[in-house]
Amino acid sequence: NKKGDRLFADWTGTSEQVKGAINNTLSFTKAATYCGVKCILPNDIPANEGFFRCVEVKAPPGTIANGVLPAACAARGLTGFRMVDCVLGALAMMLPDKVMAASDGGNTGISIGGYDTERNPFIYGDFACGTWGARPWADGLSGNSNLFANMATQSIEVCEAENPVEILAYEF
């Protein structure tokens, strides 16, 4: 919702907090909201108090958008990634020519464990990055982490050099 020079993001109606670790803190919900808004702004607008002051975020306590203790939140990124997509969807209704489509919704965690040929145990963990949504003026970008994430997939060479695994294909 926009009024004058202010934008209002209201997460009322969001599901109640859950036992699983996908609950957000209010600060994380605000950050996801700011991320979605920042995506449509010119690059020269800094993410500072002036920007934050123009975006008001409301998230009722006790929801996955604003969990209260003892709400688990270690996997909050999975919810936060989708929240960015929700913000972009809302903004697309106001500015359809400036907003990209939803992304892959979050990175997929990969865990492989076992024993190498000398019976030494190993554990390999990585996150498979998907794609950003298509933009009104171009295709989406493949192989990037979610807009709200700060991670990248390890290179195949590093994966194979440090673990007893062989990557047969690398594609989405």
Which residues fall in each region the model found?
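Glycine/proline-enriched, intrinsically flexible loops and inter-domain linkers
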Residues: 1-172
